[in-house]
Amino acid sequence: MKIVHTADWHLGKILNGKQLLEDQKYILTQFKQHMEKEQPDLIVIAGDLYDTSYPSKEAIGLLEETIEYLNIELKIPIIMISGNHDGRERLNYGSKWFENNQLYIRTQLENIDDPIELSGVQFFTLPFATVSEVQNYFKDKQIETYQQALNECLEQMSSSIDNNKVNILIGHLTIEGGKTSDSERPLTIGTVESVDMHSFRLFDYVMLGHLHHPFSINNSFIKYSGSILQYSFSEVNQSKGYRVLDIENNQLLNETFVPLKPLRELEVIEGDYEDIIQERIKVKNKNNYFHFKLTNVSHITDPMMKLKQIYPNILALSNVVFDHSENFSHVEIKKQDDQTIIENFYKNMTDQHLSQVQSDKIKHLLSFILDREG
Protein backbone atom coordinates (compact mmCIF):
# COMPACT_ATOMS: atom_id res chain seq x y z
CA MET A 1 0.00 0.00 0.00
CA LYS A 2 1.33 3.41 -1.00
CA ILE A 3 0.15 6.35 1.13
CA VAL A 4 0.75 10.02 0.37
CA HIS A 5 0.82 12.31 3.42
CA THR A 6 0.20 16.04 3.03
CA ALA A 7 -1.16 18.83 5.25
CA ASP A 8 -1.36 22.57 5.86
CA TRP A 9 -2.54 23.77 2.47
CA HIS A 10 -3.93 26.96 4.04
CA LEU A 11 -6.00 27.82 0.96
CA GLY A 12 -6.89 31.51 0.90
CA LYS A 13 -3.72 32.50 2.77
CA ILE A 14 -2.81 36.20 2.63
CA LEU A 15 0.83 37.08 3.37
CA ASN A 16 1.60 40.73 4.16
CA GLY A 17 -1.47 41.76 2.15
CA LYS A 18 -0.66 39.49 -0.81
CA GLN A 19 -3.27 36.92 -1.81
CA LEU A 20 -1.47 33.61 -2.48
CA LEU A 21 -4.20 31.77 -4.42
CA GLU A 22 -2.22 31.89 -7.67
CA ASP A 23 0.74 30.25 -5.94
CA GLN A 24 -1.53 27.69 -4.27
CA LYS A 25 -3.23 26.78 -7.53
CA TYR A 26 0.18 26.35 -9.15
CA ILE A 27 1.50 24.05 -6.42
CA LEU A 28 -1.70 21.98 -6.28
CA THR A 29 -1.63 21.54 -10.06
CA GLN A 30 1.90 20.20 -9.62
CA PHE A 31 0.70 17.99 -6.75
CA LYS A 32 -2.04 16.56 -8.98
CA GLN A 33 0.54 15.80 -11.68
CA HIS A 34 2.67 14.00 -9.11
CA MET A 35 -0.34 11.96 -8.00
CA GLU A 36 -0.95 10.88 -11.61
CA LYS A 37 2.55 9.37 -11.59
CA GLU A 38 2.58 8.14 -7.98
CA GLN A 39 -0.82 6.41 -8.24
CA PRO A 40 -1.08 6.09 -4.44
CA ASP A 41 -3.62 3.86 -2.74
CA LEU A 42 -4.51 6.67 -0.34
CA ILE A 43 -3.95 10.40 0.21
CA VAL A 44 -3.97 11.68 3.81
CA ILE A 45 -4.50 15.42 4.43
CA ALA A 46 -3.73 16.13 8.09
CA GLY A 47 -5.62 19.38 8.63
CA ASP A 48 -5.58 23.11 7.83
CA LEU A 49 -6.91 22.78 4.31
CA TYR A 50 -8.11 26.39 4.63
CA ASP A 51 -6.37 29.34 6.26
CA THR A 52 -9.55 30.59 7.90
CA SER A 53 -12.81 29.14 9.17
CA TYR A 54 -14.62 31.41 6.67
CA PRO A 55 -12.71 30.83 3.43
CA SER A 56 -13.36 32.83 0.26
CA LYS A 57 -15.36 31.29 -2.57
CA GLU A 58 -12.12 31.14 -4.58
CA ALA A 59 -10.41 29.11 -1.85
CA ILE A 60 -13.43 26.79 -1.59
CA GLY A 61 -13.47 26.40 -5.37
CA LEU A 62 -9.77 25.49 -5.45
CA LEU A 63 -10.21 22.83 -2.77
CA GLU A 64 -13.27 21.34 -4.47
CA GLU A 65 -11.53 21.27 -7.85
CA THR A 66 -8.44 19.59 -6.38
CA ILE A 67 -10.28 17.00 -4.30
CA GLU A 68 -12.69 16.18 -7.13
CA TYR A 69 -9.80 15.53 -9.51
CA LEU A 70 -7.87 13.37 -7.06
CA ASN A 71 -10.85 11.43 -5.72
CA ILE A 72 -13.22 11.23 -8.71
CA GLU A 73 -10.94 11.45 -11.76
CA LEU A 74 -7.94 9.55 -10.38
CA LYS A 75 -10.13 7.43 -8.06
CA ILE A 76 -7.75 7.82 -5.11
CA PRO A 77 -9.28 7.36 -1.63
CA ILE A 78 -8.72 10.40 0.61
CA ILE A 79 -8.80 10.83 4.38
CA MET A 80 -8.82 14.42 5.62
CA ILE A 81 -9.15 15.86 9.10
CA SER A 82 -9.82 19.40 10.29
CA GLY A 83 -7.05 21.59 11.73
CA ASN A 84 -7.13 24.63 13.98
CA HIS A 85 -7.60 26.97 10.99
CA ASP A 86 -10.49 25.05 9.44
CA GLY A 87 -14.17 25.70 10.00
CA ARG A 88 -15.22 22.27 11.25
CA GLU A 89 -18.86 22.50 10.16
CA ARG A 90 -18.05 23.82 6.69
CA LEU A 91 -15.42 21.16 6.08
CA ASN A 92 -17.71 18.42 7.37
CA TYR A 93 -20.59 19.34 5.04
CA GLY A 94 -21.62 16.35 2.90
CA SER A 95 -19.12 14.01 4.57
CA LYS A 96 -21.56 11.11 4.97
CA TRP A 97 -22.33 10.66 1.30
CA PHE A 98 -18.76 11.50 0.24
CA GLU A 99 -17.71 8.23 1.87
CA ASN A 100 -19.45 6.40 -0.99
CA ASN A 101 -16.49 7.59 -3.10
CA GLN A 102 -13.97 6.85 -0.34
CA LEU A 103 -13.59 10.50 0.60
CA TYR A 104 -13.44 10.39 4.39
CA ILE A 105 -13.77 13.76 6.17
CA ARG A 106 -13.28 13.53 9.91
CA THR A 107 -13.86 16.65 12.02
CA GLN A 108 -15.53 15.28 15.17
CA LEU A 109 -14.21 13.61 18.32
CA GLU A 110 -17.11 11.15 18.08
CA ASN A 111 -15.16 9.22 15.43
CA ILE A 112 -11.83 8.82 17.22
CA ASP A 113 -12.41 5.17 18.19
CA ASP A 114 -13.86 4.29 14.78
CA PRO A 115 -10.86 3.70 12.50
CA ILE A 116 -11.12 3.73 8.72
CA GLU A 117 -9.82 0.42 7.38
CA LEU A 118 -8.26 0.28 3.92
CA SER A 119 -6.17 -2.61 2.54
CA GLY A 120 -5.86 -4.11 6.01
CA VAL A 121 -4.51 -0.89 7.56
CA GLN A 122 -6.42 0.93 10.32
CA PHE A 123 -6.40 4.74 10.17
CA PHE A 124 -7.36 6.52 13.39
CA THR A 125 -8.28 10.19 13.04
CA LEU A 126 -7.71 12.90 15.65
CA PRO A 127 -8.96 16.25 14.29
CA PHE A 128 -7.99 19.43 16.10
CA ALA A 129 -9.97 20.06 19.28
CA THR A 130 -9.47 22.53 22.11
CA VAL A 131 -8.94 21.37 25.68
CA SER A 132 -12.43 22.59 26.60
CA GLU A 133 -13.96 20.61 23.71
CA VAL A 134 -12.22 17.47 24.94
CA GLN A 135 -13.42 18.28 28.48
CA ASN A 136 -17.00 18.53 27.25
CA TYR A 137 -16.78 15.40 25.10
CA PHE A 138 -15.52 13.24 27.96
CA LYS A 139 -17.50 15.21 30.59
CA ASP A 140 -14.29 15.50 32.61
CA LYS A 141 -13.34 18.89 34.04
CA GLN A 142 -10.06 17.43 35.34
CA ILE A 143 -8.66 17.70 31.80
CA GLU A 144 -6.70 20.96 31.84
CA THR A 145 -3.78 20.49 29.43
CA TYR A 146 -3.29 19.29 25.87
CA GLN A 147 -1.31 16.33 27.15
CA GLN A 148 -4.21 15.27 29.38
CA ALA A 149 -6.66 15.80 26.52
CA LEU A 150 -4.54 13.67 24.20
CA ASN A 151 -4.20 10.93 26.80
CA GLU A 152 -8.01 10.69 27.12
CA CYS A 153 -8.41 10.47 23.34
CA LEU A 154 -5.71 7.81 23.02
CA GLU A 155 -7.26 5.81 25.85
CA GLN A 156 -10.56 5.72 23.97
CA MET A 157 -8.79 4.71 20.75
CA SER A 158 -6.90 1.88 22.46
CA SER A 159 -9.95 -0.40 22.54
CA SER A 160 -10.06 -0.37 18.73
CA ILE A 161 -6.36 -1.11 18.17
CA ASP A 162 -5.83 -4.40 16.30
CA ASN A 163 -2.27 -5.61 16.77
CA ASN A 164 -2.64 -7.97 13.82
CA LYS A 165 -2.89 -4.94 11.54
CA VAL A 166 -0.92 -1.77 10.91
CA ASN A 167 -2.38 1.05 13.02
CA ILE A 168 -1.79 4.63 11.84
CA LEU A 169 -2.82 7.84 13.61
CA ILE A 170 -3.65 11.01 11.66
CA GLY A 171 -3.55 14.12 13.85
CA HIS A 172 -3.16 17.89 13.97
CA LEU A 173 -1.05 18.91 16.95
CA THR A 174 2.36 20.02 18.23
CA ILE A 175 5.00 17.54 19.33
CA GLU A 176 7.23 18.78 22.16
CA GLY A 177 10.51 20.09 20.75
CA GLY A 178 9.20 20.45 17.21
CA LYS A 179 10.53 23.31 15.06
CA THR A 180 7.92 26.05 14.74
CA SER A 181 7.38 28.80 12.15
CA ASP A 182 5.87 32.29 12.34
CA SER A 183 2.91 31.24 10.16
CA GLU A 184 1.57 28.69 12.65
CA ARG A 185 -1.28 30.05 14.72
CA PRO A 186 -0.98 28.91 18.37
CA LEU A 187 -3.38 26.10 19.20
CA THR A 188 -4.28 27.77 22.46
CA ILE A 189 -3.71 30.84 24.61
CA GLY A 190 -2.33 30.36 28.11
CA THR A 191 -1.93 26.58 27.93
CA VAL A 192 1.09 24.48 27.00
CA GLU A 193 0.08 23.05 23.64
CA SER A 194 2.87 20.55 22.93
CA VAL A 195 2.60 16.84 23.70
CA ASP A 196 5.15 14.12 24.40
CA MET A 197 6.09 12.04 21.36
CA HIS A 198 6.21 8.94 23.57
CA SER A 199 2.42 9.19 23.90
CA PHE A 200 1.94 7.44 20.55
CA ARG A 201 3.39 4.00 21.30
CA LEU A 202 0.05 2.38 20.47
CA PHE A 203 0.60 3.17 16.81
CA ASP A 204 2.92 1.89 14.13
CA TYR A 205 3.09 5.28 12.42
CA VAL A 206 1.81 8.82 13.02
CA MET A 207 0.97 11.35 10.28
CA LEU A 208 0.73 14.92 11.53
CA GLY A 209 -0.22 18.40 10.47
CA HIS A 210 0.19 21.85 12.07
CA LEU A 211 3.96 22.43 12.11
CA HIS A 212 5.07 23.75 8.72
CA HIS A 213 8.63 22.43 8.69
CA PRO A 214 8.64 18.95 7.08
CA PHE A 215 11.50 17.95 9.36
CA SER A 216 10.12 19.54 12.53
CA ILE A 217 11.06 16.50 14.58
CA ASN A 218 13.59 13.72 14.21
CA ASN A 219 11.62 10.53 14.67
CA SER A 220 11.37 7.42 12.52
CA PHE A 221 7.64 6.79 12.98
CA ILE A 222 6.19 10.26 13.72
CA LYS A 223 6.23 12.61 10.73
CA TYR A 224 5.01 16.06 9.74
CA SER A 225 4.45 16.57 6.03
CA GLY A 226 4.98 20.33 6.41
CA SER A 227 3.03 22.96 4.51
CA ILE A 228 2.81 22.96 0.71
CA LEU A 229 4.30 26.47 0.47
CA GLN A 230 6.51 28.80 2.48
CA TYR A 231 3.96 30.84 4.46
CA SER A 232 6.27 33.11 6.47
CA PHE A 233 9.73 34.57 6.10
CA SER A 234 10.86 32.29 8.93
CA GLU A 235 10.42 29.42 6.43
CA VAL A 236 12.94 30.76 3.90
CA ASN A 237 15.01 27.94 2.35
CA GLN A 238 12.67 25.26 3.73
CA SER A 239 11.82 22.50 1.26
CA LYS A 240 8.08 21.99 0.79
CA GLY A 241 6.36 18.90 -0.55
CA TYR A 242 4.71 15.69 0.63
CA ARG A 243 5.63 12.32 2.12
CA VAL A 244 5.18 8.83 0.73
CA LEU A 245 4.88 5.76 2.96
CA ASP A 246 5.01 2.21 1.57
CA ILE A 247 3.47 -0.70 3.48
CA GLU A 248 3.63 -4.33 2.46
CA ASN A 249 2.60 -7.47 4.35
CA ASN A 250 1.88 -5.46 7.50
CA GLN A 251 5.39 -3.99 7.42
CA LEU A 252 6.43 -0.35 7.00
CA LEU A 253 8.90 -0.59 4.14
CA ASN A 254 10.16 2.92 3.54
CA GLU A 255 9.18 6.56 3.87
CA THR A 256 10.39 9.41 1.64
CA PHE A 257 9.92 13.16 1.35
CA VAL A 258 9.15 14.44 -2.15
CA PRO A 259 9.78 18.17 -2.74
CA LEU A 260 7.56 20.38 -4.89
CA LYS A 261 8.77 23.45 -6.79
CA PRO A 262 6.79 26.65 -6.06
CA LEU A 263 5.93 29.40 -8.51
CA ARG A 264 7.71 31.85 -6.21
CA GLU A 265 9.90 31.41 -3.14
CA LEU A 266 10.35 33.70 -0.16
CA GLU A 267 13.68 35.50 0.17
CA VAL A 268 15.15 37.67 2.91
CA ILE A 269 17.85 39.98 1.54
CA GLU A 270 20.11 42.13 3.69
CA GLY A 271 22.36 44.90 2.42
CA ASP A 272 22.64 48.50 1.35
CA TYR A 273 19.74 50.19 -0.46
CA GLU A 274 21.94 51.36 -3.34
CA ASP A 275 23.38 47.88 -3.85
CA ILE A 276 19.85 46.48 -4.18
CA ILE A 277 18.65 49.22 -6.53
CA GLN A 278 21.77 48.84 -8.69
CA GLU A 279 21.26 45.03 -8.60
CA ARG A 280 24.73 44.43 -7.18
CA ILE A 281 23.32 41.88 -4.73
CA LYS A 282 22.27 38.60 -6.33
CA VAL A 283 18.77 37.21 -5.74
CA LYS A 284 17.37 33.83 -6.80
CA ASN A 285 14.54 35.28 -8.86
CA LYS A 286 13.32 38.87 -9.19
CA ASN A 287 9.72 37.62 -9.12
CA ASN A 288 10.09 35.96 -5.72
CA TYR A 289 8.47 37.37 -2.59
CA PHE A 290 11.00 39.55 -0.78
CA HIS A 291 11.66 40.96 2.65
CA PHE A 292 14.45 43.50 2.26
CA LYS A 293 16.43 44.54 5.35
CA LEU A 294 18.39 47.55 4.14
CA THR A 295 20.66 50.30 5.38
CA ASN A 296 20.64 53.87 4.06
CA VAL A 297 16.90 53.91 3.37
CA SER A 298 15.69 56.69 5.66
CA HIS A 299 16.62 59.53 3.30
CA ILE A 300 14.96 57.88 0.26
CA THR A 301 11.53 59.12 -0.80
CA ASP A 302 9.10 56.18 -1.24
CA PRO A 303 11.76 53.43 -1.38
CA MET A 304 9.09 50.71 -1.58
CA MET A 305 7.78 52.08 -4.89
CA LYS A 306 11.30 52.28 -6.32
CA LEU A 307 12.12 48.73 -5.25
CA LYS A 308 8.87 47.38 -6.73
CA GLN A 309 9.94 48.62 -10.15
CA ILE A 310 12.70 45.99 -10.04
CA TYR A 311 11.24 43.46 -7.58
CA PRO A 312 7.45 43.54 -8.18
CA ASN A 313 6.60 41.12 -5.36
CA ILE A 314 8.38 42.80 -2.47
CA LEU A 315 6.25 42.23 0.65
CA ALA A 316 8.29 43.85 3.41
CA LEU A 317 10.98 46.49 3.83
CA SER A 318 12.93 47.04 7.05
CA ASN A 319 15.16 50.05 7.55
CA VAL A 320 18.27 48.80 9.33
CA VAL A 321 19.49 51.91 11.09
CA PHE A 322 21.72 50.58 13.84
CA ASP A 323 24.96 48.86 12.97
CA HIS A 324 26.25 47.04 16.06
CA SER A 325 29.77 47.12 14.63
CA GLU A 326 29.75 50.87 15.27
CA ASN A 327 28.77 50.55 18.94
CA PHE A 328 31.01 52.23 21.45
CA SER A 329 32.09 50.69 24.72
CA HIS A 330 31.45 52.49 27.99
CA VAL A 331 35.14 53.38 28.16
CA GLU A 332 35.09 54.89 24.66
CA ILE A 333 31.97 56.92 25.45
CA LYS A 334 33.50 58.30 28.63
CA LYS A 335 36.41 59.60 26.55
CA GLN A 336 34.07 61.58 24.26
CA ASP A 337 32.56 64.99 24.80
CA ASP A 338 28.77 65.44 24.89
CA GLN A 339 28.59 66.90 21.39
CA THR A 340 30.39 63.89 19.85
CA ILE A 341 28.19 61.39 21.73
CA ILE A 342 25.03 63.07 20.39
CA GLU A 343 26.38 63.26 16.84
CA ASN A 344 27.38 59.57 16.87
CA PHE A 345 24.00 58.54 18.31
CA TYR A 346 22.18 60.48 15.58
CA LYS A 347 24.35 58.86 12.90
CA ASN A 348 23.70 55.35 14.26
CA MET A 349 19.94 55.91 14.42
CA THR A 350 19.42 57.64 11.06
CA ASP A 351 22.41 56.77 8.88
CA GLN A 352 22.87 60.52 8.40
CA HIS A 353 25.14 63.19 9.83
CA LEU A 354 23.79 66.20 11.67
CA SER A 355 23.52 69.28 9.49
CA GLN A 356 25.61 72.30 10.44
CA VAL A 357 22.48 74.06 11.69
CA GLN A 358 21.54 71.06 13.88
CA SER A 359 25.08 70.77 15.19
CA ASP A 360 25.17 74.46 16.10
CA LYS A 361 21.82 74.22 17.91
CA ILE A 362 23.01 71.26 19.99
CA LYS A 363 26.24 73.08 20.80
CA HIS A 364 24.21 76.07 21.93
CA LEU A 365 21.89 73.91 24.08
CA LEU A 366 24.79 72.07 25.70
CA SER A 367 26.50 75.35 26.46
CA PHE A 368 23.27 76.71 27.96
CA ILE A 369 22.83 73.61 30.17
CA LEU A 370 26.43 73.65 31.35
CA ASP A 371 26.22 77.36 32.17
CA ARG A 372 23.03 76.75 34.24
CA GLU A 373 24.69 73.87 36.11
CA GLY A 374 27.93 75.80 36.64
From Swiss-Prot:
Record's subunit section: Heterodimer of SbcC and SbcD.
InterPro entries from the UniProt entry: Calcineurin-like_PHP_ApaH, DNA_Repair-Maintenance_Comp, Metallo-depent_PP-like, Mre11_N, SbcCD_nuclease, SbcD, SbcD_C
Molecular function (Gene Ontology), one example: 3'-5' exonuclease activity
Protein name (database record): Nuclease SbcCD subunit D
Pfam families assigned to the protein according to its UniProt record, in alphabetical order: Metallophos (PF00149), SbcD_C (PF12320)
Superkingdom as given in the UniProt entry: Bacteria
Family: Belongs to the SbcD family.
A biological process term (GO) from this entry: DNA replication
Job of this protein: SbcCD cleaves DNA hairpin structures. These structures can inhibit DNA replication and are intermediates in certain DNA recombination reactions. The complex acts as a 3'->5' double strand exonuclease that can open hairpins. It also has a 5' single-strand endonuclease activity.
Encoding gene, per UniProt annotation: sbcD
Record key words, sorted: DNA recombination, DNA replication, Endonuclease, Exonuclease, Hydrolase, Nuclease
